[in-house]
Amino acid sequence: MSTLSVIIPTLNEERHVGALLSDVASQSRRPDEVLVVDAGSTDGTIEVVRRFPFARLLEGRPPVACGRNLGGRSATGDVLVFLDADVRLPERFFEDFFAEFERRRLDVACPLYATLDSTPVIEGFHALFNLLFKTVQRTLPSGAGHCLAVRRKVFRVSSGFDPKLKFDDIELIRRLAKGRRFGIVEQRVFVSDRRYREQGTPRMMLRYALMALVFALGKFAWANRIDYEFGKHEH
């Protein structure tokens, strides 16, 4: 059985990272290693992480790609799982996700996603994206970067996440999938709807639709022009 390393980059995530680490601790299949890479939080993120003795804290720096790369280089598991700090996991997520991951002999994979306590409009929008990801998984590999699993040997021979790009996760999926097995796995993670709440549902839906078009064209540098703020997650 493959060993699992979970990598969680953080920057001012005291309101969210504790819930994720609690979910990790409650998994029916516990990961073999949990790395939290903090990029200089000024809130209580560090104190929250230290309440979980199984989590190894690393000192990183912005942007998030640098934290992901540091975690990926430091991890020892056969499979690396990159998680955003505001993700929530069902109790059997790792067990069920990796049963399918191994059965399909995947090298790179993303789950489906949904939001907790969200509106029907947002849920319908996410369902549409899930369907899109599943439909194009062999021809145009894409996925929600909230959760990304990749075999360590595949990650190590790549240049990792590109810190020059805002959407480094999607670009890495596309790059790693070339000549390898990529798949969308039927298990779900739950993501925060905070961007919709803070910036408005119509505005965020328009941004995500624009991103989808840019990613379909493979113009990841163009996506840097999209107004999409990172690294200020105090809310």
Where are these regions (language model features)?
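Conserved donor NDP-sugar-binding/catalytic core segment of glycosyltransferases
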Residues: 92-121
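Short, acidic, metal-binding catalytic loop of nucleotide-sugar glycosyltransferases
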Residues: 22-31
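Short aromatic/hydrophobic "clamp" motif used to bind/position activated sugar donors
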Residues: 80
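A conserved acidic beta->alpha catalytic loop
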Residues: 30, 38-46, 87
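Glycine-rich, basic loop-to-helix element that forms the pyrophosphate-binding segment
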Residues: 59-75
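Acidic donor-binding/catalytic loop of UDP-sugar-dependent glycosyltransferases
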Residues: 44, 85-99, 174
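Acidic helix N-cap motif at the loop->helix transition within catalytic regions
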Residues: 15-19, 43-51
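Acidic donor-binding loop at a coil-to-helix junction in glycosyltransferase catalytic cores
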Residues: 166-172
